[in-house]
Amino acid sequence: MSDFSMETLKNLRQQTGVGLTKCKEALEHAKGNLEDAVVYLRKLGLASAGKKEHRETKEGVIAALVDERGAALVEVNVETDFVANNSVFRAFVTSLLSDLLDHKLSDVEALARVMSSQEPSLSVEELKAVTMQTVGENIRISRAFYTPVNSGQSVGIYSHGNGKAVAIVFLSGSENQEALAKDIAMHIVASQPQFLSKESVPQEILEREREVFSSQVAGKPQEVVEKITQGKFKAFFQEACLLEQAFIKDPEVTIQGLIDRAAKASGEPLRVEHFVFWKMGA
């Protein structure tokens, strides 16, 4: 039987911001004494982290990893760029990628509850508290992404600005086109497409753009309106859709043309299945 009440456990959690499991452990170690339990958690580097959680986090890093378990992406924010480049903080971020891959998670709240691969005796939330204590700043896990990597896929990652923007590209049709996938990922970071193709643009976006274009040419003959609108849509697709964009390394060819050229050279039916692009704070 426990030496503490549920009310004491609740008070310890509210006072320290530490997870349920570690609070129970602290109270058991302290034989139900609240003050001793707080001291115990402080010695573990957990108890003072809660005081930092209100601080604003504008800096940080976006990190990505692809291996046999799949592809993972995580954005973790801190208060200053100095800590964003701290080795302790970076090690914590790297461990999150492994946790996402191990548990196949894309949910930040679910990630916080799993046991950390970096420190198996602590949950991710508890390790975050320890890391906050070590670096002296608030840490926020903002978003997470996981997807399996299938056979016959090539995956490319490109990171810009030491993790300020990251793209992952998934090519189907070959497992040997990582260089092409990385080139396209680099292009995505530079050109920031909103959609994969013309066909993937939502209907409401098309209708919005058509209204804007029509208002710009109001009063002109219908055939002129149609011609101008078609031209404006072409320009819109070339700016917003990855496959229609001019390749950043060779503007004479579109991304679709680049893929077609690689497919012809390799004899493999290549296509971009999807991509993920994250920019810090966006």
Curated annotation (Swiss-Prot):
Molecular function as annotated in GO: translation elongation factor activity
Cellular-component GO terms for this entry: cytoplasm
Annotated CDD domains: UBA_EF-Ts
Pfam families: EF_TS
Top-level taxonomic group: Bacteria
Subcellular localization(s) per the UniProt record: Cytoplasm
UniProt entry keywords in alphabetical sequence: Cytoplasm, Elongation factor, Protein biosynthesis
Entries under InterPro entries matching the protein: EF-Ts_dimer_sf, Transl_elong_EFTs/EF1B, Transl_elong_EFTs/EF1B_dimer, Transl_elong_Ts_CS, UBA-like_sf
Region Involved in Mg(2+) ion dislocation from EF-Tu, residue ranges: 80-83
Homology family: Belongs to the EF-Ts family.
Stated role: Associates with the EF-Tu.GDP complex and induces the exchange of GDP to GTP. It remains bound to the aminoacyl-tRNA.EF-Tu.GTP complex up to the GTP hydrolysis stage on the ribosome.
Identification of the protein by name: Elongation factor Ts
Organism: Chlamydia trachomatis serovar L2b (strain UCH-1/proctitis)
Gene name of the record: tsf
